[in-house]
């Protein structure tokens, strides 16, 4: 039975963080589109560095810390509300706020196909990492696994965005995914042991790119 539960958890995690899960993440680049337009990301190597830095030291790291906290607090409605408010406040731009809130709303709507009391405990609208953390925690998925899948999904989407923006090819994209595996693993483990005191980022260029994207005239992405 234990093995069956582990397989069930794997199937659910795979479904929830699959590109096919209907949350619309393909519409967002998290400022990457502006970074490409500004010449900050021009090839596959720079794309890999950009993504890796965000995962380890940027907004994605903060998302991982918030996910871990909501995973721990999934049974406490009051604590979930507090961390949800914090996650929303940490969104560094209008588009970043829109992105994380709409993804969170879409994730919860789709994840209700797997009924659980956690949906009653969560606020109606929450940031994406809060939604993922609370739902995976409620379904007994280990935090390291939830975090690794969440980070891998982000990297995959960012790579896809880079390909669509013309700074990398498909083989480059696969190589980036392979090359960032160890980094994803390390960050997932670090985030699983984190507390809210570990929140913080050092990716000023990425934050500025996210802000500048708001006034970009020609765009493929919503952020």
From Swiss-Prot:
Predominant localisation class: cytoplasm
Keywords, sorted A to Z: Chaperone, Cytoplasm, Nickel insertion
Any one GO CC term of the record: cytoplasm
Localization per Swiss-Prot or TrEMBL: Cytoplasm
Residue ranges of coiled coil: none
General function of this protein: Required for maturation of urease via the functional incorporation of the urease nickel metallocenter.
Subunit structure: UreD, UreF and UreG form a complex that acts as a GTP-hydrolysis-dependent molecular chaperone, activating the urease apoprotein by helping to assemble the nickel containing metallocenter of UreC. The UreE protein probably delivers the nickel.
Name this protein carries in UniProt: Urease accessory protein UreF
Organism: Rhizobium johnstonii (strain DSM 114642 / LMG 32736 / 3841)
């Amino acid at each position: 039975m234990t093995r069956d539960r582990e397989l069930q958890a794997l199937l659910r995690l795979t479904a929830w963080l699959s590109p096919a899960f209907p949350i619309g993440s393909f519409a967002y680049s998290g400022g990457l589109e502006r970074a490409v337009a500004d010449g900050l990301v021009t090839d596959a190597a720079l794309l890999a560095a950009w993504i890796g830095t965000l995962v380890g030291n940027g907004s994605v790291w903060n998302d991982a810390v918030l996910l871990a906290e909501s995973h721990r607090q999934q049974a406490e409605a009051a604590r979930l509300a507090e961390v949800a408010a914090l996650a929303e406040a940490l969104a560094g731009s209008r588009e970043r706020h829109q992105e994380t809130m709409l993804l969170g709303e879409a994730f919860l709507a789709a994840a209700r196909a797997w009924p659980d009391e956690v949906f009653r405990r969560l606020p109606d609208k929450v940031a994406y990492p809060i939604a993922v953390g609370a739902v995976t925690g409620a379904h007994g998925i280990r935090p390291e696994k939830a975090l690794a899948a969440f980070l891998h999904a982000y990297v995959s989407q960012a790579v896809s965005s880079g390909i669509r923006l013309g700074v990398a090819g498909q083989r480059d994209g696969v190589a980036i995914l392979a090359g960032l595996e160890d980094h994803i693993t390390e960050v997932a483990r670090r985030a699983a042991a984190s507390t809210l005191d570990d929140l913080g980022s050092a990716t000023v260029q990425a934050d500025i790119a996210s802000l500048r994207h708001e006034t970009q005239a020609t765009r493929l992405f919503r952020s």
